[in-house]
Amino acid sequence: MGQAVSDYTDATFASEVLQASTTVLVDFWAPWCGPCRLMAPMMDWAAETYAGKLSVGKLEVDGNPQTRDFFQVQGIPTLILFRDGKEVARQEGAIAKPQLQAFLDAHL
């Protein structure tokens, strides 16, 4: 069994993402968003495939408006890759596994 996908909140985002020692992929999503639900299995895949190189988590945007607004997330799903407390890459909109793999490989 691979690494689990974490759930981040406004309260935990700084300590678990911005201060993390590894690169972190965050999926900004909402339960009412159909394309977001399609991305969920790919977050599990990324957590398992890139275990040791990448931490993966998600942030539900409606319940965590501070983090959503700080990073100016306008549409969902939005994937943001963080390293050393900074955004290094962003992908807006749902993508297929080959595109997710290319996105991650380009930045890891």
State where each predicted segment sits.
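A short beta-strand-turn-helix
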Residues: 5-24, 65
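Conserved Rossmann-like nucleotide-binding pocket used by diverse enzymes
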Residues: 4, 29, 55-57
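Conserved helix-turn-beta segment immediately C-terminal to the redox Cys motif
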Residues: 21-23, 38-59
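Conserved redox-active cysteine motifs that mediate thiol-disulfide chemistry
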Residues: 28-42
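N-terminal targeting signals for export/organelle localization
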Residues: 1-5, 102
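Structural microenvironment flanking redox-active thiols in thiol-disulfide oxidoreductases
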Residues: 61-68
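Short pre-active-site segment immediately N-terminal to redox-active cysteine/selenocysteine motifs
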Residues: 21-22, 29-32, 75
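Non-catalytic, surface beta->alpha helical segment in thiol-disulfide oxidoreductase systems
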Residues: 75, 81-108
